[in-house]
Amino acid sequence: MNKILGLLFGIGLLIFVCALARAQKSQSGENVDVRGGIDHGEFDRLLKKYVNEQGLVDYGTWKGSASDISALDHYLDQFAAKIDKPTQGNEKAASLVNAYNALVLRWILSNYPTESIWQLKNSFTAKRNDIAGRKVSLDDIEHGTLRPSIGYRAHAVLVCAARSCPPLQRFAYTAENFEEQNDRAYRRWLAREDLNKFLSNERKVEISSIFKWFKADFDKAGGVPKILGRYASQSVREFATSGNYDIKYLPYNWGLNDQGAHGRNYSRVQLIFDNLFK
C-alpha cells in the first residue's frame, strides 16, 4: 500500500511540476518591426476611460461599448500594414509596448468573461496579431523584440492581464516621453505593497517573481538590488540598494486584472488545471 501511495504521489508531483512549467511564459520569439508615425491618442483615451488607479480594467463595461471596441480595433489597424522602413529607438519601443498591451486587452475582450488569460488557448505563442504585414505573437513582441532592445525596462510596462502584473498605466506610451513614463511605471509598481514589499526591520524583501524569471535582464543592468534601489520609494531606497537582505519571490497571481469579480479567486490549482486540460 505504501508503495502504491508513493507511486501515486510521485505521479501527482510530476504532473504538478510539468503543468507549472507550462504555466510559466516562454522566453523566445522573433523580431517585430513597426512603422513610424502611429497615433496613440485613441488608445490613451481608452486607457483613461477603462483602467483605474490600481491598474484594473473595466472589461465588462468596455465589452458592452461597440463604439469603444471599434475604436480599439481601429487603433490596432494602424500597426497592420506592410512597411518598407521600420522605425527604431524609443518610437519603436513605445509603439510595441502599446501594441502588446492593446492586443492583450483585445484578446481578453474577445473572450470575456474569463478568470485568467491562461484559460484561453495559446494566448502568448499564437501568431494571430497583424503587425507590419505579418502575423506575430505576443512572445515575438516581448521576447523577440523588446527584451533584446530595452532589456529590464520592458518588465514594468508590459501587462499580460494578470493581477500580479505590474499595474497597467492609464496612459499610452510615446516616443517623446518613453524614458520618463517607463520610470514612472517602475516606481508605481514597486510602491505597490501587494506586489513588492520592503521589510527593512526583517532584512527581507518580498518581490515579484518577474525578478526571478528574468534575472538575466536585471543582471545586465547591474543586478536586482540596483534596480530596486533606483525605483523603490525614498523611505526604503537605501535599504533596497544595499542588497543586504533575503529575497523571497511572491507567488504569481494569474487571475484576470478585472475591476469586477472575474479573476479574484483564481487559484494556483486552477492555473495548473487550465494548463493541463485546456
Regions found by a protein language model. Give the residues of each.
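Sec/Tat signal peptide C-region and signal peptidase I cleavage site
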Residues: L20-R22
